[in-house]
Amino acid sequence: MQLNSTEISELIKQRIAQFNVVSEAHNEGTIVSVSDGVIRIHGLADCMQGEMISLPGNRYAIALNLERDSVGAVVMGPYADLAEGMKVKCTGRILEVPVGRGLLGRVVNTLGAPIDGKGPVEHDGFSPIEVIAPGVIDRQSVDQPVQTGYKSVDAMIPIGRGQRELIIGDRQTGKTAMAIDAIINQRDSGIKCVYVAIGQKASTIANVVRKLEEHGALSNTIVVVATASESAALQYLAPYAGCAMGEYFRDRGEDALIVYDDLSKQAVAYRQVSLLLRRPPGREAFPGDVFYLHSRLLERASRVNAEYVENFTKGAVKGKTGSLTALPIIETQAGDVSAFVPTNVISITDGQIFLETNLFNSGIRPAVNPGISVSRVGGAAQTKIIKKLSGGIRTALAQYRELAAFSQFASDLDEATRKQLSHGQKVTELLKQKQYAPMSVAQQGLVLFAAERGYLEDVELAKIGSFEAALLAYADRDHAPLMQEINQTGGYNDEIEGKLKSLLDSFKATQSW
C-alpha cells in the first residue's frame, strides 16, 4: 500500500478544520479537612455564601463560612468516603428545590427528591430556598380566616390567612395533633398545605402521612422530611425548602398553609452546624444569628396584594391576592417559655397557642391555656358568626379560673358564684374535642350559641359531650339547609339567630341525649 502525501495532508487539514476546541473554566479547590459532615476547602477564591459546591460522587456541599484562605462547607448527604486532597468545584448556583403542583400528595426530602416510592416528582421548575420576604408595599392586611376546626382555637385564638401563629408547649401536649387537624380541615377549603417534619423519627412521620391519607388530606399536602437520622445540615435547611414550595402557591394568587414541626429541632441542628464551623457560641451555645435564622424564615409567611401577584405572574393572574400562613411549633422544657428560642419565636410571630401539660393530663384536650394564648391579627379575619358568639366564651373561662382558685378556700358560696362556676365547668367541657374530628363553621356556631344563650344550664356536666354529639347529629339531619347556609356565608343576623333558637328549642324538647 502506497501512501499519497497529498491525500494525507488534505485529511489532516480537514481534521484541523473540524476540530472544535471546548474550554470550560472551573473554580476548583482541594479538600483540606473532613470532620462530622463539615469540610474545609482551599482554593475556592470566587465562592459565594450559600453556594452549592460539587463533590465527587454526584453530591453537593453548601458554603457557609467564607474565610481568608479557606471555605467551610456542610455536606448534603453521606461524607464517610470524602478525604483530604479530593478536588471540588464551584457550581455558581444557590441551593434550589423543585416546586409546583406535582409535589402535592408526595413525600420528599430537603432537596425535593421523592422518598415515598411513587416515582419521580413532576415539577414546574426550581426555586431558591433562600428568598427575601415580600416588602411592606407588597403586603395586604390579614382579613380572611383559616379554620382549624377546633372550637377553642377558632373562637378564642382565630388565625387569618397570611398570619404566623406559634403552637408552643412541652412534649406530648398535642402540638403536632393540632397542626395535623388544621391540615385535615383544609381538604375542602382550597388551601394547599405543606408539612415540614424536622428531626423526627421516621415511624412518627410515616404515621402522620398515613393519617393524612386516611382523612383525604394528603392529595392537598406536600410533606417535606428531614428525619433524626439525617445530617444536621439537611435538618437546618428543611424549613426553607418547604417554605419555597409553599411560596409557589402564594405568588400565584392562591392560599397555602405551612407547618414547621418543629423549629426547636431546627435551631439545635443549626447550633450543631455552627459549632462544627467554629463560629463563636452565645447564649445556650446558640450562635449569634439564631434570631435571624427564624425571622428570615417566618417573615416569608405573608398575605401579598393583587399587584404583587400580577407582577410576579407577568399579568397571567389578575385581581387575586395570595397568602402563606405559618404554624411554627416550638417545644418547651418544663413549660419554660422564657428560654432563648421560645422567646425569639414568640417575638417574631403574630400570636401563640400555649398548650399546657397539666390541662392535657387532666383530660382537657386540646390543652389550650386561654389566659396566655393570643392572636394579634386574627380577630379581623374571624367569621361573623364565630366572632359574635365567642365573645362571652373567653370571659366565662377567665372568670371560672379565677373563681375556681378562690372557691378552694371558701366554705360557702352564694348562688351567683355557684352558677358562674357551673357555667365555666360546662364551657370547659364543651370546648373539649377529639383528635381527627375538625368541626365546620356551622357546627361551631351552633355549639357556641348553645353555650352563650344558656341552653347548657339544665344539662348535667357528665352529659355535655353526649348533648353536643346529639345536637350536631340532629342539626345535620333535620336542619341541613340552615347548616349549609352558615357554612357558605359565615354570616350572622336576626334571621339566623331566630333559626338557631328554634333549632335548639326543638332539640331540647326531644330530650334525646
From Swiss-Prot:
It is found in: Cell inner membrane. The record marks S373 as: Required for activity. GO terms for molecular function: ADP binding; ATP binding; proton-transporting ATP synthase activity, rotational mechanism. Gene3D superfamilies: 2.40.30.20, ATP synthase alpha/beta chain, C-terminal domain (1.20.150.20), P-loop containing nucleotide triphosphate hydrolases (3.40.50.300). GO terms for cellular component: plasma membrane; proton-transporting ATP synthase complex. Its main location: membrane. ATP binds at G169, D170, R171, Q172, T173, G174, K175, T176. InterPro entries: ATP_synth_asu-like_sf, ATP_synth_asu_C, ATP_synth_asu_C_sf, ATP_synth_F1_a_nt-bd_dom, ATP_synth_F1_asu, ATPase_a/bsu_AS, ATPase_F1/V1/A1_a/bsu_N, ATPase_F1/V1/A1_a/bsu_N_sf. It is a peripheral membrane protein. It catalyses: ATP + H2O + 4 H(+)(in) = ADP + phosphate + 5 H(+)(out). It comes from the Bacteria. Its EC number is 7.1.2.2. Pfam families: ATP-synt_ab, ATP-synt_ab_C, ATP-synt_ab_N. Keywords: ATP synthesis, ATP-binding, Cell inner membrane, Cell membrane, CF(1), Hydrogen ion transport, Ion transport, Membrane, Nucleotide-binding, Translocase, Transport. Produces ATP from ADP in the presence of a proton gradient across the membrane. The alpha chain is a regulatory subunit. Belongs to the ATPase alpha/beta chains family. PANTHER family: ATP SYNTHASE SUBUNIT ALPHA, MITOCHONDRIAL. F-type ATPases have 2 components, CF(1) - the catalytic core - and CF(0) - the membrane proton channel. CF(1) has five subunits: alpha(3), beta(3), gamma(1), delta(1), epsilon(1). CF(0) has three main subunits: a(1), b(2) and c(9-12). The alpha and beta chains form an alternating ring which encloses part of the gamma chain. CF(1) is attached to CF(0) by a central stalk formed by the gamma and epsilon chains, while a peripheral stalk is formed by the delta and b chains. This is ATP synthase subunit alpha.
